[in-house]
Regions:
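Contiguous, function-dense segments enriched for cysteine-driven chemistry
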Residues: 1-3, 29, 70, 79
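Catalytic phosphate/metal-binding cores of nucleic-acid and nucleotide-processing enzymes, i.e., regions
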Residues: 3-45, 52, 65
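Glycine-rich, flexible loop segments associated with nucleotide phosphate handling
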Residues: 50-56
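Short, compact, well-ordered microdomains
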Residues: 56-89
Length: 89
């Protein structure tokens, strides 16, 4: 499927997505909706307050092959690819 369809599956159906050609085992992208989290860093605590909740906008996250999660932005190649698929967990 194309990226637009994959992105809609991630955003509206809460389905993890990946490209068929990705080499990393267990890698996938998922949508993280906007939310508020307790301030974690010194900067956030100074700006928003020690016990504040910081509002974050929605973003895409990548579960990488090393098991860590990172914010993710698609490359042009990712956006134009037609090899996206829904991942079964």
């Amino acid at each position: 499927m194309n990226f637009q369809d994959a992105l809609e599956a991630a955003r509206f159906a809460e389905m993890p997505i990946a490209r068929k050609g990705w080499n990393g085992k267990g890698m996938f992208v998922y949508h993280v909706p906007a939310a508020a989290y307790p301030a974690q860093t010194g900067v956030a605590k100074r700006v928003f307050g020690e016990n504040a909740k910081v509002e974050y906008g929605a973003y895409l996250a990548l579960k990488s092959a090393d098991g860590k999660v990172y914010p993710w932005t698609p490359s042009q190649a990712d956006q134009l690819a037609d090899d996206w698929e829904i991942v079964t967990l």
